[in-house]
Structure formats: C-alpha cells, structure tokens
Amino acid sequence: MLHSRAASFESTRVSVPHRYALSVTTYLDDILVAHRRRAAKDERRRDDLFDAVGNLAPTRAFADALRGESLRVIAEIKRKSPSKGELSIDLDPQVVAQEYASGGASAISVLTDEPHFSGSEEDLQAARDAVDLPILRKDFTVDERDVLDARLMGADAVLLIAAALSDLEIRSFLAVAHEVGLDALVEVHDGGELDRALAAGARVIGVNQRDLRTFEVDTDRCVSLASLIPSEVVAVAESGVRDAKDAERLAAAGYNAVLVGESVVTASKRSSAVSALVGHQVAASREAVR
C-alpha cells in the first residue's frame, strides 16, 4: 500500500547539521527558518496524506521528458525573486505555460513559495491545467509532507536543495517522492553537494550556478562539474542561462536540460525566448568545456 512506509518517516524531521549550514546568513537561511517553523506546527497525519495520494492519477514523467539527443528546456513561472525583485508579478500562469509549451519547453517549473516569490499552489494548478507537460514544484522542501503536498497539488517532480538538507533528509525525501510517483530534482552547488546527492540516490541533478550568499552567477560552475555526473543521471543546468550561446555550451558539456526563469519570463515574446534555447546537440559524454 502507498502508506506502508509512512510510519518509517515519522522520525525524519531533522535539523540541518551545522556542517551543512551556509557560512553566513543568507536569504536561504531566512526562508528555511520560516519553512521549518511551519513544518513543526503541521499536525496533519502522514498516513492521511499517503491515502489521499493513492486516489490520484499517475504523474507525467518529468525525468524521461528531459532525456534525448538534444537539449531540453524547463521553463519557469516566476513572479519575483529575492535577488531581482518583481519580474512579472501579474502574470497569468495559464498563458505563460502555454507560451512556454509553444516555444518547445519539455517541462514547466512553478514557484509555489508565496512570501519570497509570490508563488502559489494555484499557480501550479493553473499551469498544469493549461499544458500536458510535466510540472516541477519549485519550493523549499524541509519535511516529507512538503513532498506529499507537491503530489497532491498536481506536481510531477519536487525540488530538493542539498545545501538546505541533511543526508538523512535527502534520502528520506527521495524515498517518499519515489513512493508516490514523483521525480526529484536534487539541486547542488559544488562537488561536495554533488557527492552527497549521488550517494543518496539522486536520479536528476541540478547544478545551480548562482551563489546563495552573493547572488552572483558563475557560468563555469556547470561545465566544471559536468564530468562528475554519471551518464545515467539526468543533468540539469540552473541559473545564468540567458541565450543560445549559453545553452549550446552546456549541451556540449553533456547537460540534458537547462532550467531558465528570469530570461524567459521577462521576455517580450516568451515562446521565442524558449525556442532559442532548445535543440542543441547534447554531447555523448560529459566533460569540462572551456
């Protein structure tokens, strides 16, 4: 039964070990404090959530949608961000999702964090209703109930940020995700986090080129880590992808997909912005490309 493992997750709420904490206070720290406080007050029974998931239709295959010989695009519905402020605060998620799909996106990412990104569950559901593409819930997962909520609101994949989670949490949340049919994009920023994600069993790795402390983007980060990602793992490049040249370089390094937000959501013609990024030949092997 779907909830057969639920009891084993009752004790998995774990504070992030100090060795995994960021060296200075960042926007991520503040967000995580808020999300963990919310999770600590959540009195819903996990068994009830597992039972509710059991009544849902199958998910759309997120990881499979990112595989292929040409570069895939995960286009993001993002109203604002802590680093850039308002991007497209009054967007219609259904319209944006359709624009992304017409441009050739293979999946849609939707921010659901409200306080910091002005996202919502309703944005995700509207996007899902508008297109047939897999939907990634982009939020700060700190409890297994966040994973179950993603499934219940209609997501096909969930984000796990390695910098925000302990090894036990990554493994536990991956197990819950797979139990309920979700794929998980495990986000890393360096080789140490990549090793942790792979050891936990991550099947989809996202390398984020944005520094969580300074917001600066290091466009060499993805290519320098590419050769460390096993060929059977789906590799996604995040942040700093602005044009066809960036996309081509990442495809040449062996990345299966790019996740893009600001550059497409603020474009005057979103479908064209997406189409400029798709279709680049993905290298047969992953290696650092300068």
List PLM regions with ranges.
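An N-cap/entry alpha-helix motif that binds or orients negatively charged groups
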Residues: 23-90
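Conserved, mostly hydrophobic/aromatic
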Residues: 31, 75, 100, 150, ...
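N-terminal active-site wall of soluble small-molecule enzyme domains
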Residues: 72, 77, 84-185, 191-196, ...
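Catalytic cores of alpha/beta
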Residues: 142-153, 191-200, 241-260
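Glycine-rich phosphate-binding active-site loops on the catalytic face of alpha/beta enzymes
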Residues: 149-169, 207-214, 255-273
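Catalytic-face loop-and-helix region of soluble metabolic enzyme cores
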Residues: 204-260
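C-terminal helical cap(s) of enzyme catalytic domains, especially alpha/beta-barrels
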Residues: 224-228, 266-290
